[in-house]
């Protein structure tokens, strides 16, 4: 059997190769991609990646939890859920000035995007007024902005967009069939509706899922199929590996094979050629070789730093060392900006100072991960 007959998406590997943008992938086609020989799959994914991106550029973000704990949702993986005893205390919404301070530090550390997350089912009116001001203040620093605040209706989405919010994150988490095993307090349709509201308001969509929650291989394919059906595709697609947190129902789930995770990264890249595929939660548990394979498979976005909301994230120095080993560099806010910005000496000095200032700052969530 030839490689062409094995791969339902196979096209010529010439320098003029251009992947096809599709929204109609069948589940069987996606499963066939997952089943490809590993080297064939990664080769195909790297072809797609190079057709649309600088293959050595990685979009770098910082993530700050602006309101932590006591979420009313019952997501079985989440330490912020009020349904489980994970030792995570409830915190009030951060003051605007504290958020702006952390955004300044993030920019000094080299981040191009500042993401803010709140443990809510949906933002209340008084909270929405505060977070829209946060967006404007952070945006004024020259950073791209992203928020994850739970479900939003059309009016809330429009107000966030008017405030200048660039991206809104709302993950699908898993397949429609497996979803009820993970969450019961909101429906899959609720999630899709929020994404539709975000898109209608004119914001960019950040949406992905979590792997390693006990789902079947077909569920992973079905999750990606749901993301591909979104038109347009999400601009950012975080692929998370479950971080098992003591006290959650998922704390004893069987570990996921890292190579299975890499396959999912590669398939996501093939299916969504122009999206940034984010290597997200779970990166702390990955060795350098696994992370390198993820970048080869098409991951090109990460959170950079010490903490991803309430779960661990590699240290800044380790992230920078890995970038150096692999010859990677941060993607500028404008992907077509002059390459000289990547090696700016002043940014290097600022980064070193920022790391030192932030070592003991519990509020800071740096970003090279995702």
UniProtKB/Swiss-Prot annotation:
Cofactor(s) demanded: [4Fe-4S] cluster; [2Fe-2S] cluster
Source organism, top-level taxon: Bacteria
InterPro entries from the UniProt entry: Aldolase_TIM, BATS_dom, Biotin_synth/BioAB, Biotin_synthase, Elp3/MiaA/NifB-like_rSAM, rSAM
Domain Radical SAM core: 56-283
Residues reported in the UniProt entry to bind [4Fe-4S] cluster: 71, 75, 78
Transmembrane parts of this sequence: none
Chemical reaction(s) catalysed: (4R,5S)-dethiobiotin + (sulfur carrier)-SH + 2 reduced [2Fe-2S]-[ferredoxin] + 2 S-adenosyl-L-methionine = (sulfur carrier)-H + biotin + 2 5'-deoxyadenosine + 2 L-methionine + 2 oxidized [2Fe-2S]-[ferredoxin]
UniProt pathway annotation: Cofactor biosynthesis; biotin biosynthesis; biotin from 7,8-diaminononanoate: step 2/2
Ranges annotated as biased composition (Basic and acidic residues): 327-344
Start and end residues of each stretch annotated as Disordered: 327-346
PROSITE patterns (alphabetical): RADICAL_SAM
Function: Catalyzes the conversion of dethiobiotin (DTB) to biotin by the insertion of a sulfur atom into dethiobiotin via a radical-based mechanism.
Official protein name in the record: Biotin synthase
Source species: Chromohalobacter salexigens (strain ATCC BAA-138 / DSM 3043 / CIP 106854 / NCIMB 13768 / 1H11)
């Amino acid at each position: 059997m030839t490689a062409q007959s094995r791969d339902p998406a196979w096209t010529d590997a010439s320098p003029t190769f251009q992947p096809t943008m599709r929204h109609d992938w069948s589940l069987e086609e996606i499963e066939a991609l997952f089943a490809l020989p590993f080297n064939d799959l990664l080769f195909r994914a790297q072809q797609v990646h190079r057709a649309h991106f600088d293959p050595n550029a990685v979009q770098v973000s910082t993530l700050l939890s602006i309101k932590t704990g006591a979420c009313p949702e019952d997501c079985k993986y989440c330490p912020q859920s009020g349904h489980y005893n994970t030792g995570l205390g409830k915190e009030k919404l951060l003051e605007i000035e504290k958020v702006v301070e952390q955004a300044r530090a993030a920019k000094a550390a080299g981040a191009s995007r500042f993401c803010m997350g709140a443990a809510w089912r949906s933002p209340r009116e008084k909270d929405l007024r505060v977070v829209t001001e946060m967006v404007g203040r952070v945006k004024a620093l020259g950073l791209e902005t992203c928020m994850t605040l739970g479900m939003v209706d059309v009016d809330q989405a429009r107000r966030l967009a008017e405030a200048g919010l660039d991206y809104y994150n709302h993950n699908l988490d898993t397949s429609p069939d497996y979803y009820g095993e993970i969450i019961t307090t909101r429906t899959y349709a609720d999630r899709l509706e929020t994404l539709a509201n975000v898109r209608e308001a004119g914001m960019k969509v950040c949406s992905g899922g979590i792997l390693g929650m006990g789902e079947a291989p077909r569920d992973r394919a079905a999750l990606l199929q749901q993301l591909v059906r979104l038109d347009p595709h999400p601009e950012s697609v975080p692929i998370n590996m479950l971080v098992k947190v003591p006290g959650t129902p998922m704390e004893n789930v069987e570990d996921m094979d890292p190579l299975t995770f890499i396959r999912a990264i590669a398939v996501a890249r093939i299916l969504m050629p122009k999206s940034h595929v984010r290597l997200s939660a779970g990166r702390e548990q990955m060795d350098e070789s696994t992370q390198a394979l993820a970048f080869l498979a098409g991951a090109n976005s990460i959170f950079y730093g010490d903490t991803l909301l309430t779960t661990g994230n590699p240290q800044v120095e380790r992230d920078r060392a890995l970038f150096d080993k692999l010859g990677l560099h941060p993607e500028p806010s404008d992907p077509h900006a002059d390459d000289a910005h990547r090696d700016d000496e002043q940014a290097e000095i600022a980064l070193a100072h920022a790391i030192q200032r932030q070592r003991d700052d519990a509020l800071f969530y740096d970003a090279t991960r995702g």
